[in-house]
Amino acid sequence: MRTEWVAKRRGQVNVSQMHYARQGVITEEMHYVAQRENLPTDLIRDEVARGRMIIPANINHTNLEPMAIGIASKCKVNANIGASPNSSNLQEEVDKLNLAVKYGADTVMDLSTGGGNLDEIRTAIIKASPVPIGTVPVYQALESVHGTIENLTADDFLHIIEKHAQQGVDYQTIHAGILIEHLPLVRNRITGIVSRGGGILARWMLHHHKQNPLYTHFQDIIEIFKRYDVSFSLGDSLRPGCTHDASDEAQLAELKTLGQLTRKAWEDDVQVMVEGPGHVPMDQIEFNVRKQMEECSEAPFYVLGPLVTDIAPGYDHITSAIGAAMAGWYGTAMLCYVTPKEHLGLPNAEDVRNGLIAYKIAAHAADIARHRPGARDRDDELSKARYNFDWNRQFELSLDPERAKEYHDETLPADIYKTAEFCSMCGPKFCPMQTKVDADALTELEKFLAKEPVTQS
């Protein structure tokens, strides 16, 4: 789809969407996004130029269908997939990708740490994906030194980062915000450092007593990202891993650094979004969103959850979707899904489905609350179908049509019940939606009420 679009850009020093937007150019990707979002093309260009919106679109991911992440666009959902040393393989990950796209993932992150050749897995995922692909290059950097963190060098990180860019990765989580001076701030936490990438960098700094190499070589990463139009997803290495640790000094110190790095990337017209927590009580979610906007100059916020309680292993797609809906309402641009397997194991296909649907609900609820154009249209159409007992239309409009039909058909499977004016909840005699009050009847009632006082029986 994008082969012709990007052909004329190849070889230029900077091919980022932000670079073109700041020159006043409306790219084909911006036109495409404007149509998808039902927004003016000028607004898309201006938001990208300002840094409040990103269009993650590596020039080597030519089968990508461009999308936007930003406060002016619909709230988006990311799904994580990835093989581990103990579970999964290439085909399973491609199957998970296809499932994630089927159930509405706007982007997908490949978090593979093992399970085969990581380059082959990543290449297969990018080739198969119409949505932006994100990665965490620190994972493969660690694999390249056989898991010995102390042996990692800045060149190891940069080599893997460029490899991912060359392969077509659209955005990369870069854990450049955790600094050596931040590490003592986690002393009073219950769960310490829960970011895998952050933990790797922390151990490296503790061993070498040197500054984070991703921070000291941040300009080198910018130069790579300019050449391929890779977007930064600035990792929150010190995100809270439990509600006790939320909004603490460590988290906020790193957030301030992430704001500085955001503005540094913008100096070279490189797109940025900023990752956020995590585990946050409901009463602190608005503060966290507002604080990110303040520190990071309104760069798009991308949060994991947040989980609003820590006591529901097996149900963390619910505990986190509650926080995600609130975060989206307050202005978070993208929500990273959490599956029922969070904290327990690697998610399977059914976990991916359940996590995604929970987060599509959260994102859609946020869009309605923020009065985004057309956000409630689908709700209204489904409500009309429900009132008219148009069961097949209800299924069609559902976020998960197969599940809706499956639940209906558990008790009323025959085709005749697809036109029935009841379901198994109320049966044929008690459904209140059978009470159809037409306009003429209401007009007559209004005339009566205007003339006669209502008597109490």
UniProtKB/Swiss-Prot annotation:
GO terms for molecular function: 4 iron, 4 sulfur cluster binding; carbon-carbon lyase activity; zinc ion binding. Disulfide bonds: none annotated. Binds 1 [4Fe-4S] cluster per subunit. The cluster is coordinated with 3 cysteines and an exchangeable S-adenosyl-L-methionine. Its cofactor is [4Fe-4S] cluster. [4Fe-4S] cluster binds at C423, C426, C431. Keywords: 4Fe-4S, Iron, Iron-sulfur, Lyase, Metal-binding, S-adenosyl-L-methionine, Thiamine biosynthesis, Zinc. One of its GO terms (cellular component) is cytosol. InterPro entries: ThiC (IPR037509), ThiC/Bza_core_dom (IPR038521), ThiC/BzaA/B (IPR002817). Pfam families: ThiC_Rad_SAM. Pathway: Cofactor biosynthesis; thiamine diphosphate biosynthesis. Belongs to the ThiC family. This is Phosphomethylpyrimidine synthase. The lineage of its organism: Bacteria, Bacillati, Cyanobacteriota, Cyanophyceae, Nostocales. The gene is thiC.
